[in-house]
Amino acid sequence: MKAVILAAGVASRLRPLTENTPKCLLKVNGKTLLERTLDNFIENGITDFLIVTGYLQNMIIDFVTANYPKLNIKFIENKDYSTTNNIYSLYLAESFAGGEDFILSDSDILFSKDIISALLTNNNPDVLAMNRHELGEEEIKIISDNECNVLEISKVCSIEKAVGESVGLPRFVQ
C-alpha cells in the first residue's frame, strides 16, 4: 500500500499565514499538518509516499527530507499549481501508483490514525472515509445508494440526499 499526498495548493484563503509558508507546514499544537499526516500513515505501516508539490515546493521538500530521511518519499511538481486543482495533481501522480493500491490524502487535513487503519482493514475494493454530521453548503458531500455505493461527491449536490461529508481520504484498489 502506498500513500499519495497532495500538497501543491496556494491556500489563498489563509493569507497572510500562507504568504511564506505552505499550508501543510502550518503548525497545530506544535506539529505541522504534513507531519501529522505522514506520522498517521507511518503508524499504520505505510512507508512508501508520493507528495505532489507546487507552491513553495522547496520548503516542503526540505522539511520532509530533513525530518523523514529514511522513508521512501518521491516528489512530483505540479508546475501549474496556480491554475489547476487537486484533480490535476492526482493525474500527475498516476504513474507512481504503478497498478498498486494507494490511499490519497490532502496534505492539510487533521485526522486520526484510526481512519487509516479502518481504510486498510475494510474488505471493499475502493473505500472513502466520511464524517456523518449536519451538512452545509461548503462541505464536499457524498450521496450513496442503499448498498453504500457512492453515486456523487460534490459541494453542489443535494444536502438532503447526502449521507455525509468526504474527509479527503479515499483508498483505491488497482
Functional labels for PLM-detected ranges:
Residues 13, 59-62, 114:
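Phosphate- and divalent-cation-binding pockets in alpha/beta enzyme and binding domains
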Residues 8, 53-54, 107, 131:
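Cofactor-binding loop segments of dinucleotide-utilizing enzymes, especially the Rossmann-like FAD-
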